[in-house]
């Protein structure tokens, strides 16, 4: 099973990916984790990524694509993977398609969790209130203004992936506002034929 979960911040992608990785025994491939691992391993591509990050710049698509390609070749990905935070742009999606094709692989599905953005903001505010009530530390970017900025960035940069994957016939849309168990069941229904 090779899967991409799409949706704005707070849509539940991480929750669903966690449930799917446990059930199917496949890894969740997070761009951030892959970058950190490549840097820690001091691989050639990791050294290039570190130099860019140390200079305070964004890591290029070329470097990210190569790191993803190498990670997909790892033995734990033999039965599939869930991509988290990649691709973020249409050029990355096109590179992923070429990369998988070159390895004789293809995506089984691209699942978009459709959510109401106002409800997401309320969900985030509730999470912050619960965190404060527990006496725990709140993340610096867990405030309505920062969250709305992340939503705008998602709409501008990542949302065009929906159109791209709709055009390839791989996109499946699920109501991300449903209870977690219902969302999981719907994802499983999509993946059964895969």
UniProtKB/Swiss-Prot annotation:
PROSITE patterns referenced in this protein's UniProt entry, alphabetically: ADENYLATE_KINASE (PS00113)
Annotated region described as NMP, given as residue ranges:
30-59
How is this protein annotated for GO cellular component?
cytoplasm
Which UniProt keyword terms apply here? ATP-binding, Cytoplasm, Kinase, Nucleotide biosynthesis, Nucleotide-binding, Transferase
Q: Which residues bind ATP?
A: 10-15, 127, 178
Question: What molecular function does GO assign, one term?
Answer: adenylate kinase activity
Q: Which domain of life is it from?
A: Bacteria
Q: Which reaction is this enzyme known to catalyze?
A: AMP + ATP = 2 ADP
EC number from the UniProt entry: 2.7.4.3
Q: Which family does it belong to?
A: Belongs to the adenylate kinase family.
Question: Which purpose does this protein serve, as stated in its record?
Answer: Catalyzes the reversible transfer of the terminal phosphate group between ATP and AMP. Plays an important role in cellular energy homeostasis and in adenine nucleotide metabolism.
What does the subunit section of this Swiss-Prot or TrEMBL entry state? Monomer.
Checking NCBIfam families in the record gives: adk (TIGR01351), PRK00279.1-3 (NF001381), PRK14527.1 (NF011100), PRK14528.1 (NF011101), PRK14531.1 (NF011104), PRK14532.1 (NF011105)
Q: What is this protein called?
A: Adenylate kinase
- Organism field: Brucella melitensis biotype 1 (strain ATCC 23456 / CCUG 17765 / NCTC 10094 / 16M)
Q: Which gene encodes it?
A: adk
């Amino acid at each position: 099973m090779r899967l991409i979960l799409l949706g704005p911040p707070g849509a539940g992608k991480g929750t669903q990916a966690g449930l799917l990785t446990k059930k199917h025994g496949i890894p969740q491939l997070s761009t951030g984790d892959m970058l950190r691992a490549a840097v820690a391993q001091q691989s050639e591509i990791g050294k290039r990524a570190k130099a860019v990050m140390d200079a305070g710049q964004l890591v290029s698509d070329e470097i990210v694509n190569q790191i993803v390609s190498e990670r997909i070749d790892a033995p734990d990905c033999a039965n599939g993977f869930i991509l988290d935070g990649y691709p973020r742009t249409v050029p990355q999606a096109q590179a992923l398609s070429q990369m998988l094709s070159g390895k004789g692989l293809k995506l089984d599905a691209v699942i978009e969790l459709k959510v109401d953005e106002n409800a997401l903001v309320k969900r985030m505010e509730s999470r912050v209130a619960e965190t404060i009530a527990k006496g725990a530390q709140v993340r610096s970017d867990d405030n309505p203004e920062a969250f709305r900025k992340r939503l705008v960035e998602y709409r501008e940069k990542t949302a065009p992936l929906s159109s791209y994957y709709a055009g390839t016939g791989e996109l499946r849309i699920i109501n991300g506002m449903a209870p977690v168990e219902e969302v999981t069941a719907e994802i499983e229904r999509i993946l059964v034929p895969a």
